[in-house]
Amino acid sequence: MSRNKDIKIYNISNAFVRIEYNDKVLLCDPWLTNGIFDKAWMVYPPVYDVDKAINGVTHVFISHIHKDHCDFNLMRHFPKTTEFYIPDIFPNDKIKLQLNNLGFNNIHMLPINKDISIGSDMVFNVIPPMNMYGHETEEMVKANINGVPLDCGLLLTTEFHKICILADDSPYYFDHLTDLHEKLNKVDLLMLPYNGYAA
């Protein structure tokens, strides 16, 4: 791995994070298009310099298919050489299909809980969904309904850094916490959802 220790991390908005390391510019869960979800959701505070947020992008990680984490309108402006990394769970094949339709071909479906080298200086490990609904309510435990868990997180490791980005992957189910606790040993930065609905 590279000997460079410098890493820059910017929280652009919501779960949208920009990470600069060596020759990589990684965007996680890019979202800047206002009016998603029937014009109800807006980027706040507003991001006025979109070019600055996405300039130089080389890699993108998308944790799940929701529009506040997967903004196809924004991603159509990325270079066609951009490499995309998506957890290989249902329904993320739809993300891959839409990216193909936009002209992107460097799309990698990542297995859960497995270290995947991104070049020679970075490793991704997808954290599995730790919730069904993402709602903070005891009634969900009692509900006789099974949701479709899709909110994944990312553990990003370099030779000098360990960063965990949970996005919307709220750790509600305690049976998953032992594995997560082991992964987070000596983590440098942990990004958690600030409520049960959005990161």
Each language-model region and where it sits:
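Conserved beta-strand hairpin/beta-sheet module of binuclear metal-dependent hydrolase folds
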Residues: S2-D49, G147-D169
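Metallo-beta-lactamase
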Residues: S2-N4, P87-H161
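Divalent metal-coordination and catalytic microenvironments
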Residues: I19, D29, H64, D71, ...
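Pre-active-site segment of Zn-dependent metallo-hydrolases
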Residues: Y21-F61, F72-H77, G134-E138, Y172-N185
